[in-house]
């Protein structure tokens, strides 16, 4: 699909299979989500710009490339997005963090916003929005709408699973935002869940129903 990158690294696919299993425990699911987020982050940040810095090694002075982490924002769609956030911050601890509170009304399947906090200068930063599931796309669309209202324009979206319906809706709303995912699954069921999916990522991560 145009504008969509499927991250098919063997380690990503292996860990995703274990996460899909219904017998995988809450603790294991949480650990695997953190591990897989590190691998996904590696791919979504592959083309980040580096600057040169003069450093001293134990032997001599040299010019060496370094990442400008302060120009990067990880935006987590609460609450499940936080599961991806932790592993990504392990890789880029200097990145800024945004939290966007959006939940899906299970009757209407429409997003309900309840919280938004982001750096004031989002217009000057690369924003990587994270949410494990791109189902209908409504929550992620609403989150990115909010970021764009604040001036953000350099945005990427990272998820673990995506449904074709969600991708179509998302790309129609935000054709300028590339999508990175570990898998494009078959379809949405009548309740708006990704099939075959892995269940509700937030519930499985936190042990709630």
From Swiss-Prot:
Reaction catalysis annotation: UMP + diphosphate = 5-phospho-alpha-D-ribose 1-diphosphate + uracil
Activity-regulation annotation: Allosterically activated by GTP.
Cofactor(s) essential for the protein: Mg(2+)
Pathway connected to this protein: Pyrimidine metabolism; UMP biosynthesis via salvage pathway; UMP from uracil: step 1/1
SUPFAM superfamilies: PRTase-like
Record's keyword terms, sorted: Allosteric enzyme, Glycosyltransferase, GTP-binding, Magnesium, Nucleotide-binding, Transferase
GO molecular function, one term: GTP binding
Residues bound to 5-phospho-alpha-D-ribose 1-diphosphate: 79, 104, 131-139, 200
HAMAP family in the record: Upp_B
Record function comment: Catalyzes the conversion of uracil and 5-phospho-alpha-D-ribose 1-diphosphate (PRPP) to UMP and diphosphate.
The protein's name: Uracil phosphoribosyltransferase
Organism from which the protein derives: Rhizobium johnstonii (strain DSM 114642 / LMG 32736 / 3841)
Gene of this entry: upp
């Amino acid at each position: 699909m145009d504008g969509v990158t499927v991250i098919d690294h063997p380690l990503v696919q292996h860990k995703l299979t274990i996460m899909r299993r219904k017998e995988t425990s809450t603790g294991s699911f949480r650990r695997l989500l953190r591990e897989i987020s590190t691998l996904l982050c590696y791919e979504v940040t592959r083309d980040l710009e580096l600057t040169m810095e003069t450093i001293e090694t134990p032997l001599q002075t040299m010019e060496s490339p370094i990442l400008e982490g302060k120009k990067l924002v990880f935006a987590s769609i609460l609450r499940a997005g936080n599961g991806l956030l932790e592993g990504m911050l392990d890789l880029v601890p200097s990145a800024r963090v945004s939290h966007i509170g959006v939940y899906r009304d299970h009757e209407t399947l429409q997003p309900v916003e309840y919280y938004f906090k982001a750096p004031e200068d989002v217009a000057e930063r690369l924003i990587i929005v994270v949410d494990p599931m791109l189902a209908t796309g409504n929550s992620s669309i609403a989150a990115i709408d909010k970021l764009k209202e604040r001036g953000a324009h350099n945005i990427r979206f990272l998820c673990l699973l995506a449904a074709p319906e969600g991708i179509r809706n998302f790309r129609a709303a935000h054709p300028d935002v590339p999508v990175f995912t570990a898998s494009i699954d078959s379809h949405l069921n009548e309740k708006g869940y990704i099939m075959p999916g892995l269940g509700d990522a937030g519930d499985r991560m936190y042990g709630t129903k």
